[in-house]
């Protein structure tokens, strides 16, 4: 159990400045966001004697920027991309320095398909006693068919390149996975 009775409450201030706009009769969207985060007593789970333990990690001071775009190149096709950059004075577990995503969506009547590639670099999986970072590339794919007004059949594949990576040290993420099912919306 990661329980720790000596934990102090987290304190955090977050400042953001963002701008977004739609152009070309709503077919093109872009946005940018700048942020600054300052806090202390952040809680993270670390491994102590092979077991997880929640601890206060001290200060956090991050700043960065995010940008995203989307463009309907055709009524059935949409391109999307986003990028985020994060500078960390005090590294945090599961926080990447850079993340880039690009994808394409297709929708026609009852059919919907999407695919995208995500590149992550400088993701901290451990910070104590020694910093450890991961870099990886993921490819995901999803398709669905609307069978009625409240239900969709779906199939999806995640990490289709079967990348070996961890978000938290000691906990490997699954390689390629596929699943299907029914989504019911009430």
Regions found by a protein language model. Name each.
Residues 1-2, 42-50, 82, 86-95, ...:
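Outer-membrane beta-barrel translocator domains and adjoining extracellular loop/strand segments
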Residues 3-9, 20, 53-57, 69, ...:
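Outer-membrane beta-barrel proteins
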Residues 9-63:
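Membrane-embedded beta-barrel scaffold of Gram-negative outer-membrane proteins
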Residues 11-15, 36, 59-63, 96-100, ...:
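Residues that define the transmembrane beta-barrel architecture of outer-membrane proteins
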Residues 17-21, 65-71, 81, 102-106, ...:
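Residues on the lipid-exposed face of transmembrane beta-strands in outer-membrane beta-barrel proteins
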Residues 23-25, 106-110, 149, 186:
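A generic beta-sheet turn/junction motif
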Residues 31-40, 55-123, 152, 161:
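Gram-negative outer-membrane beta-barrel transporters
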Residues 38-40, 74, 119-126, 141-186:
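C-terminal beta-signal and adjacent terminal beta-strands/loops
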């Amino acid at each position: 159990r990661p329980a720790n009775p000596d934990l102090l409450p987290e304190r955090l201030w977050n400042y953001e400045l963002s701008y977004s706009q739609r152009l070309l009769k709503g077919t093109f969207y872009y946005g940018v966001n700048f942020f600054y985060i300052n806090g202390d007593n952040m809680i993270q789970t670390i491994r102590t004697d092979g077991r997880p333990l929640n601890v206060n990690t001290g200060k956090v001071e991050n700043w960065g920027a995010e940008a995203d775009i989307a463009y309907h190149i055709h009524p059935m096709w949409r391109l999307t991309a986003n990028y985020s950059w994060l500078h960390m004075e005090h590294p945090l577990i599961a926080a990447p320095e850079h993340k880039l995503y690009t994808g394409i969506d297709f929708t026609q009547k009852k059919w919907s398909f999407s695919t995208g590639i995500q590149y992550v670099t400088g993701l901290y999986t451990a910070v104590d006693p020694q910093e450890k970072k991961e870099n990886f590339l993921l490819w995901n794919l999803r398709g669905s068919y609307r069978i009625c007004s409240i239900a969709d059949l779906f199939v999806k594949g995640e990490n289709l390149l079967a990348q070996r990576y961890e978000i938290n040290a000691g906990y490997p993420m699954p390689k390629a996975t596929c699943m299907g099912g029914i989504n019911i919306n009430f």
